[in-house]
């Protein structure tokens, strides 16, 4: 069956590389190295999630990504880095995580058929 990639933090950047280098539909969460790879063009649909209060990924970097890839859905949540990880008690944000999960599942449902 169809394959997709999802990644968080370092894996978020790896998910971007899956879309740009391997042509695999991908969703990346707060991938800090994605900005360094923004010259690469997605060969498959992808979606990105970031936190507005992420101390590792400035919103200016997210703006650069948006400008370079205007057709790539990018969602920014009022949360910090690692907002999706419920083991990170200082940064987990249930509302942001739930919405990001809903968007991620909708993305894959539409593309992995």
Language-model segments: which ranges?
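Short alpha-helix in the alpha/beta-hydrolase fold that links the catalytic acid
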Residues: 57-67
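Acidic/histidine-enriched, beta-strand-rich ligand/metal-binding domains
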Residues: 15, 65-72
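Conserved hydrophobic packing residues within short motifs/helices of P-loop NTPase cores
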Residues: 27, 47-49, 75
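Acidic catalytic loop of the alpha/beta-hydrolase fold
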Residues: 53-57, 81
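C-terminal catalytic histidine-bearing segment of alpha/beta-hydrolase fold enzymes
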Residues: 71-113
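Short beta-strand/loop motif that positions the catalytic acidic residue
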Residues: 42, 47-50, 54
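Primarily recognizes the serine-hydrolase "nucleophile elbow" in alpha/beta-hydrolase
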Residues: 1-44
């Amino acid at each position: 069956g169809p394959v997709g990639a999802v990644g968080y933090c370092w894996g978020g950047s790896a998910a971007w590389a899956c879309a740009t280098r391997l042509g695999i539909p991908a969703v990346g969460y707060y991938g800090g190295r994605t900005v360094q790879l923004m010259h690469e063009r997605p060969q498959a649909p992808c979606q990105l999630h970031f936190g507005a209060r992420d101390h590792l990924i400035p919103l200016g970097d997210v703006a650069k990504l948006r400008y370079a890839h205007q057709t790539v859905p990018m969602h920014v949540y009022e949360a910090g880095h690692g907002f999706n990880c419920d083991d990170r008690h200082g940064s987990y944000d249930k509302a942001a995580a739930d919405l990001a999960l809903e968007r991620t599942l909708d993305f894959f449902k539409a593309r992995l058929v």
